Amino acid sequence: MVDPARARKLAKRIGTIVATAIDHEIKDPRLAFVTITDTKVTADLHDATVYYTVMGADLESEPDLVSAAAGLEKAKGVLRSKVGAGTGVRFTPTLTFVADTVPDTARHMEELLARARAADDEVARVAAGASPAGDPDPYKEPRVEDADDAEVDEPSRSRQAD
């Protein structure tokens, strides 16, 4: 087991090395739109999981996740060599590449929130013109003082004064 702070620093360093190598040194066109988003290292520093996203060539095109995964698997040996040279640890961690689902999840959540906002706006629009059915408050009646009640109270007050 190693200090968690050291593991975090190593994970950050591995992510930087892999991202730099993909951008500048590996000439595989399948990796042109790959972005490294996060890196996790196990407590024994023997395994590193590198999370990545793939963007489309333009806004309308879908990203090619399959070819990007194949390109990363092919470049895994070169990337591990770069990590070993760049980190200086005794044992170079094995690299595992995992497609990051956070952007897709965030996009899905935004769609759900937009639908909820639209439903709230529709309810507010319908409620704006609505009026309650029946009386404003059918359960309460205003209290009305009867003349009979006033006469009954007068003698009782006079007895207390005596």
From Swiss-Prot:
SUPFAM superfamilies per the UniProt record, alphabetical: Ribosome-binding factor A, RbfA
Gene3D superfamilies registered for this protein in UniProt: 3.30.300.20
Known role: One of several proteins that assist in the late maturation steps of the functional core of the 30S ribosomal subunit. Associates with free 30S ribosomal subunits (but not with 30S subunits that are part of 70S ribosomes or polysomes). Required for efficient processing of 16S rRNA. May interact with the 5'-terminal helix region of 16S rRNA.
GO MF terms held by the record: ribosomal small subunit binding
GO cellular component: cytosol
Main location: cytoplasm
HAMAP family: RbfA
Protein name (record): Ribosome-binding factor A
Source organism of this protein record: Rhodococcus opacus (strain B4)
Record's subunit section: Monomer. Binds 30S ribosomal subunits, but not 50S ribosomal subunits or 70S ribosomes.
Gene that this polypeptide is encoded by: rbfA
Family: Belongs to the RbfA family.
Domain of life: Bacteria
Keywords, comma-separated and alphabetical: Cytoplasm, Ribosome biogenesis
Region (Disordered): 123-162
GO biological process: one example: maturation of SSU-rRNA
PROSITE patterns: RBFA (PS01319)
Compositionally biased spans, kind Low complexity: 125-136
Location within or outside the cell: Cytoplasm
